[in-house]
Amino acid sequence: MLKRVVRVLRCKLPACQGALRAGAALCAMLLLLAYSAPGIYGQVRERSQDYDAAQKRLAQGWNTWDVHSVTTQVLLPEGLAIRVALQRKTTLYGDAFLEDVLIGGGPGRLTEQVFPGPHAWDGSYTDARIVWRELDLRIQSAHAGKELVMLVTPLAKDKPGHLTPAVVFSASYLWNRPGTVERLADRIEAHGPSGTVPIYLAGTEAPFCDLPVSGPYLSSELKGPVGLSTGKRRSLEEIAQLVEEEHQAYEKTLGTPRSAAVDAIQTTLGWDTIYEPEGSRVISPVSRSWSVGWGGFVLFDWDTFFAATLAAIGDRDLAYANAIETLRESTPAGFVGNYARAGGWKSFDRSEPPVGAITVLGLYKKFHERWLLEETFAPLLSWNRWWQENRSAGMYLEYGSDGKNQPENLDDDSRGTRQGAIFESGLDNSPMYDEGFFNEKTHRLEIADVGLMGLYAADCDALAEIAAVLGKTPEEKELRERAKHYRESLATLWDEKSGMFLNKDLHTGRLNPRTSPTNFYPLLARAATPQQAQRMIQEHLLNAQEFGGDWVIPATPRNDPAFKDQNYWRGRIWGPMNYLVYLGLRNYDQAQVREELARKSLKLFEGEWTAKHHVHENYNSMTGAGDDVNSSDPFYHWGALLALIDYAETNDKPSPGDYVH
């Protein structure tokens, strides 16, 4: 074990080689300890029994577990995969073959179009339309007890004279799991530790053709619907009936009247949830395209906490998994990084906005399971203390990037830089940070950040409430005092003239008039008086020259010169910003404003959801479009927060007794 760790570190950390030669035993021991910390090179920290049981419940049965393709069905825990591929035979394209299908296409290729339809939490029903090389077809799947059925249906007739396209079902065991697959005369048989799974084609098998498939497969020309079943042979009619039964069961989960928000959230998380074999876990990365581009998975800090909140409307175990796995990726320094990616690497230099405690407390208030608090309290407290110890500047907090933290992520050029500090804010190119002094010695952006302190004080409040439930009185006192301190700090950043909390340049002492929705985050911390909240809302949030209008809430006010850029955090609308502002409004007697924000957020979301089933990373605040730029992933789960706002306002209104008076 020690030799393996040292060998890996010689490759990753060449600066350590001299130290190893000079004092091999001591250095190796220190490095081994560092890499044995939770979440550094795999998941070392053991799961609690409760959480292990939750993960085992999740990682069962057939579902779209494989990150590389939404048309692949995988049986867990065995790892048996049935991959659905398409062959297109034309003079124009040659014998084109599509084996991996991603929503929005994958890195470097944008050939297929996917219109994701319903996806049940447990994979009991999935439905997607695929458009590729002039093919237009529908792929559905359903559970038949513990077995799987699939139905592939052409939606349009092929052009006269074209060679008939084909669908190809191949089988294999993923992730080096034990098992063998063989082709028999009328079926495929997969033999694994839990037994044999026969796989049957319902359709006319195509004559021999040379396909780029490395294992046994079943193929049929797409002259009409084609089916597949496991366990036993089924007719096309039987398969179609089973698919429709599961479709109707899915519809019943949406309530009466049918909830578009529940449909959107369940579908989004359904398609974005994968099995991550490196950590033997079920998680919901932001999108499959992002994960494939990052080597298999990438967990961004606040993004994945929001995924936990989204999942809570229908899948408790998945909600827990997303929150807990984000915390299990904490660095040796005790904070949750900006990202954690395949291969065990993460942003050791920087964190991201602290929304963990409010997420966990929200889950506890919904499900009332104490073990969740016991599982998460220690890493949440460590992270909370890290902000105070590493990002405080007198009475304020500022963002930073500690580029010399070990181990250095050498392929991340932003570590230790101004851009790295801005990345810690989560607002990669916000005009709020166009100016401001970056201290090369402290690696801090010397700006007292209103948004950060609002989120942090809310984090302290939520964590104090968790500490109280767990009977941790000293920690509760510590956290309440810290929340009070930063509320008082925020009070010094109130600008009476503008009627807004403003960021402060700590290098010059000047307040920064450039704002974003983060300037409303003091509402989350109850740091604004009712009178201040009223001014912020009336003079800024509802002001059509700033954050109001038909499409809300822009990341940059409409009267800022950067608004016209409509480029990422410069002017576009982001689900998490709307959601956090909405949570802040719940602390005040602003029911009408909340309802308007919920209505407008849902209207924005429903535009591309209805037309294309897109859930965008961000949206144009002048047109409401999401697909007008390449920098807006079309199926990024936090876009569904726009629908969650309306769901919360409809189903979980705050009590007037909770308002700040």
Task: Set out the residue ranges of the language-model regions.
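Long, well-ordered core segments of solenoidal/helical folds
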Residues: L269-P277, D315-F335, T376-G394, R482-M500, ...
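The feature captures the catalytic groove of carbohydrate-active enzymes
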Residues: P212-T230, A333, G337-V355, L361-W371, ...
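N-terminal secretory signal peptides that target proteins for export/translocation
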Residues: M1-G18
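Sec-dependent signal peptide recognition
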Residues: R21-A25
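Substrate-binding groove/exosite segments of carbohydrate-active enzymes
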Residues: T256-L361, K365-K366, L373, L381, ...
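C-terminal capping/lid segments that line or modulate ligand- or cofactor-binding pockets
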Residues: V44-Q73, G79-A81, S347, E352-F367, ...
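Catalytic cores of transferase enzymes with a strong primary signal for eukaryotic protein kinases
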Residues: A142-E147, L155, S235, I239-G293, ...
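Terminal accessory carbohydrate-recognition/targeting modules of carbohydrate-active enzymes
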Residues: L13, L26-A261, G295, N587, ...
